Each structure stands twice: as structure tokens, then as C-alpha cells.
């Protein structure tokens, strides 16, 4: 990949593949103007923290298996609903 056009093609493919395979929201959230890098944001909602954890691990595994990208790292954040 040597251009923004190539990068956008790969990112679009990733967004479509992950969106089809997993019930998550996914978008490119940073580095849109760099052809060498992309940052993806992935969101999942569930009543079970364990379910979200398994889901995010599955998404990460799918990304790591791709031959057209290199996964440099992951950062996970969790928000819990306040008790009423």
C-alpha cells in the first residue's frame, strides 16, 4: 500500500468485513490523511461484560489474521451503566 487511495480501499474492506462478521460499530477515527497508518474505533454494547470481552477479542483476532495489515496495538476501554 503506497497511497491514500490504496489505504482507503483496505480500510473500507476491513470495516465491511468486521461489520458483517461481528455485531459491533466500527469506524476509522484517526490518521485519515496518512497512507501508512489507520486507527479504528470499535464499539460494542451488552448487558454482560464477558460478552463484550469475547466479542472484542474475536474482532482483534480477525484483524490480526489479515495479511494486508499489521496490527500495532490495541487499547480497550469499558463504560458501565450507573445503577439506578
Where are the regions that the model predicts?
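N-terminal first-folded block
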Residues: 1-21, 25
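Short, charge-patterned binding micro-sites
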Residues: 26-48
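Homeobox/homeodomain signature
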Residues: 14-19, 30, 59-61
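Short amphipathic alpha-helical surface micro-motifs
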Residues: 21-26, 55-59
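A generic structural signal for short beta-strands and their flanking turns/coil linkers
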Residues: 20-22, 36-40, 70-72
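C-terminal structural segments of small proteins and small subunits
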Residues: 45-84
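Solvent-exposed, flexible loop/coil residues
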Residues: 5-8, 30-33, 73-75, 80-83
Amino acid at each position: 500500500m503506497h497511497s491514500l487511495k490504496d489505504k482507503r480501499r483496505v480500510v473500507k474492506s476491513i470495516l465491511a468485513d468486521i461489520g458483517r462478521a461481528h455485531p459491533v460499530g466500527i469506524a476509522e477515527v484517526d490518521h485519515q490523511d496518512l497512507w501508512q497508518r489507520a486507527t479504528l474505533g470499535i464499539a460494542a454494547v451488552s448487558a454482560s461484560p464477558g460478552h463484550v470481552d469475547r466479542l472484542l477479542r474475536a474482532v482483534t483476532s480477525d484483524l490480526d489474521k489479515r495479511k494486508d495489515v499489521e496490527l500495532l496495538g490495541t487499547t480497550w476501554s469499558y463504560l458501565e451503566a450507573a445503577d439506578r
